[in-house]
Amino acid sequence: MGAIVLVRHGQASFGADDYDRLSPLGEEQARLLGGWARDCGFNLGQVALGTARRHRQSAEQCLTAYGAGPASQDWIVDAGFDEFDHHEVMIRFRPDLAEPGALGHFLTQSDHPHRAFQQMFAAAVARWVGCAHDSDYRESWPAFRQRCRAGLGRLMATVDSAQDVWVFTSGGAITALLQSVLAIPDERIFELNWTLVNTGVTQLRYRPGRVSLSTLNSQAHLERQRRPELITYR
């Protein structure tokens, strides 16, 4: 039975003009993951990832620290592991935040900007997942969930069932894949999502016709550094 190791990307550049780029801390998180994987004897024999820059940068940093692994031209790139459109989900809930600079202005009005964003974004996601407004979105929650599951299905059909595959992806995709494994209802599923840390490791065991959860959101590679600032969620 092989393992599919789902890795949430390192910390991205939240609040910057280009979110889809690892922050210096995100790069460090990914390197720590690679060093930990090497020390623990994990096999990074096959790598898959979504199409986002932060996915590729996370894989690059991780494998550099690991010191081995497949060449980048041999990685499996599949849009099934891409994140949902955060911006669209947000502005369908808060159209006033669609204008350039509007989100930054919104955050400056709060003494606790990260908390204010999380509260607003959680409400936006609840609207999206609730499926009462599916026609408002280019990709509804059911469509996103099916896209992620199809990506996992393609991966399982491509690799040997005894082979381990490391998949560098995003929190939403991991959440969608775990929903079918754990049978969590829609209205509860993003309670899991909010707990997923950057470069957290979720391991699935798979064989033909069966996928089961082995490890959820492990952050041992960060915890062993005894630096709380390494634990991030965006």
Provide a role label for each language-model segment.
Residues 2, 68, 83-112, 142, ...:
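Acidic, low-complexity terminal tails and accessory targeting/binding regions
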Residues 3-5, 10-65, 140-147:
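Loop-to-helix element that buttresses phosphate recognition and phosphoryl-transfer chemistry
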Residues 5, 76-78, 214:
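General small-molecule cofactor/ligand-binding pocket signal
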Residues 10, 171-172, 217:
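Active-site metal-binding loops of divalent metal-dependent hydrolases
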Residues 34-119:
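Phosphate-coordination/substrate-recognition cap region in phosphate-metabolizing enzymes
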Residues 102-143:
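Short glycine/proline- and acidic residue-enriched helix-loop micro-motifs
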Residues 135-165:
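A mid-sequence, solvent-exposed acidic-amphipathic segment
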Residues 165-177:
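A short beta-strand-loop-alpha-helix capping motif that often carries His-Thr
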